[in-house]
Amino acid sequence: MTTSTSEQTAGTHAGPASQDVLRDLYADWSAIMAATPDLGIRLLRSLFDEWHQPTVEPQGVTYREDTVGGVPSIWCLPEGADKSKVLLYTHGGGFAVGSAASHRKLAGHVARAVGAVSFVLDYRRAPEFQHPAQVEDGVAAFDALVASGIAPQDITTIGDSAGGNLAIAIALSLKAQGRPGPGSVVAFSPWLDMENKGETLVTNNDTDALITPELLEGMIAGVLGDTVDPKAPLANPLYADFTGFPRLYVTAGSVESLLDNSTRLVERARAAGVDVTLSIGEGQQHVYPFLAGRSAIVAEEFDKLATWYRN
């Protein structure tokens, strides 16, 4: 298989104010979690449902709640979008927090940029439901979209952070079953390493406003429990076989602690012959596309993503 790769580093810097919105939100969350170590899951979810705040409402996008494949979801429907092209979006939040509502605006921006529709899943969350429930919900939604008449190759699995993990795992699960999978996969700042390793967990610890090894350890315990191997490929795609995997677009912020989750993923996928694009946002935080509508870097990123998607 021929390997086609490109690596791009965003060269336009957003103004300080636009960048501070996301960094400051993360800093506020970190301060609250540090001051309230026994914060319950209900309050933690309420906190992370504010994730949409840095994102400007996308123009010309309407929303519709639905249930597909038994999974509650929100459709993001840009004016003039090709409804035969679907972005199956899995939200981030350590598999435990975040929701379709917290990611609605971000998914709407991406759909508008590429000219498709987005379908944001409210998959079952940990700790009430452990791995592989989240992957199963993603596959069920994928199957239902195909059953409705959407061609598998016209579906893109896409997600951020833990949702980026799921976007990859859904495609891996379908491939392992010998079934047609998505035509492409997109991962924003994917969180993949369930062993909680990585050089940038240390080197970017002082620049990442949200992610810490301790925070990740708690999320890992919630989703894997005592029974799931942290090296299981559908839980930790860094151990997956990427032979025959769809083309892949990955973004990460240069100052985030999970940066080398992305770079290790790209290395592994490239070694298997996957067509990979890696885009690193200089000076950007975890899931910096949340700055959509207020950041020149994100506008440039979405232009690159749209070109990649259409080609």
PLM segments and residue spans:
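A fold-wide structural signal in alpha/beta-hydrolase
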Residues: 86, 115-119
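Catalytic nucleophile-loop/oxyanion-hole region of alpha/beta-hydrolase
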Residues: 99-100, 106, 119-154, 292-298
